[in-house]
């Protein structure tokens, strides 16, 4: 450990959705030359093998678990920049999506520390790839919303409603405890979704531990997925007609890509 006359540089690196080989080439190169790596709890051990020479510091950040306070992480990054040349803050998914990167950037910039953000693949995109279903579909889904319930759950009382945005495809991060409530509200709102709307839930997406649960919004509202969840794994909840493989009506299978026929029967 050495002290530098000028601060080191901090890289906020997106670790991607889970699998170690889904980190970007730039991210892997930075890990290989990092002096110290501050990593999220959800980062796979195999990814940390990419930085064998670096000091590795776990900083938590796991929904529902004891973790480092954000202001404490900010301070540790600033302090590390005084002692090391290359500092990596390894964040699950993409740093700029539900990663509180803005707080770290502001803290480092205020301290005169140079910061660079290296994007990563967010879990929603890996989830769509895993089930082989696009989040958008011509004639069916033109909008996608990513929603996190982590902070909202802390501030919201049990009886208060969840704010569901209006979009054709909805992807919820960290919403395991609220799945039935989400489904009930979407059905009751009668906007873009109904009881027969497809639902796909993925845990530990892109890793060897990945599990999938597929059904409908109605089944989700009945709590059918509650006993399926593994509380130790991150869950992704995907909802929308674009996720339907086939539409079955009167024993007739209609390919979801046949927009004209779909609109004729269901539009």
Language-model segments: which ranges?
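A contiguous loop/helix-start segment that scaffolds small-molecule binding in enzyme catalytic cores
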Residues: 7-10, 82-87, 151-267
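Residue-level signal for well-ordered alpha-helical positions
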Residues: 50, 130-131, 185
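Short, hinge-like loop/turn segments at secondary-structure boundaries
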Residues: 55-58, 75, 106, 132-138, ...
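Short, acidic/turn-prone active-site loops that include or flank metal/cofactor-
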Residues: 17, 42-44, 60-67, 121-123, ...
């Amino acid at each position: 450990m050495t002290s530098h006359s000028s601060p080191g540089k901090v890289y906020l690196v997106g670790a991607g959705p889970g699998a170690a080989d889904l980190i970007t080439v730039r991210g892997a190169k930075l890990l290989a030359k990092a002096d110290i790596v501050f990593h999220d709890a959800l980062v796979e051990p195999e990814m940390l093998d990419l930085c064998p020479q670096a000091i590795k510091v776990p900083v938590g950040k796991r929904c529902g678990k004891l973790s480092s306070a954000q202001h404490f992480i900010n301070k540790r990054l600033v302090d590390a920049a005084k002692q090391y040349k290359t500092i990596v803050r390894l964040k699950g998914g993409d740093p700029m999506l539900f990663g509180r990167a803005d707080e770290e950037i502001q803290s480092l910039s205020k301290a005169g520390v140079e910061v660079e953000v290296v994007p990563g693949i967010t879990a929603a995109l890996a989830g769509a790839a895993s089930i082989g279903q696009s989040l958008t579909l011509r004639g069916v889904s033109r909008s996608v919303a990513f929603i996190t319930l982590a902070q909202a759950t802390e501030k919201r009382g049990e009886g208060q409603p969840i704010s569901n945005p209006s979009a054709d495809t909805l992807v919820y991060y960290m919403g395991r405890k609220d799945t039935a409530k989400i489904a009930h509200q979407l059905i009751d709102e009668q906007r873009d979704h109904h009881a027969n709307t497809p639902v796909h839930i993925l845990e530990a997406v892109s890793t060897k531990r990945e599990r999938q649960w597929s059904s409908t919004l109605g089944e989700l509202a009945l709590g059918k997925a509650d006993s399926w969840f593994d509380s130790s794994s991150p869950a992704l909840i995907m909802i929308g007609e674009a996720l339907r493989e086939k539409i079955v009506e009167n024993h007739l299978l209609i390919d979801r890509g046949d927009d004209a026929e779909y609109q004729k029967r269901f539009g």
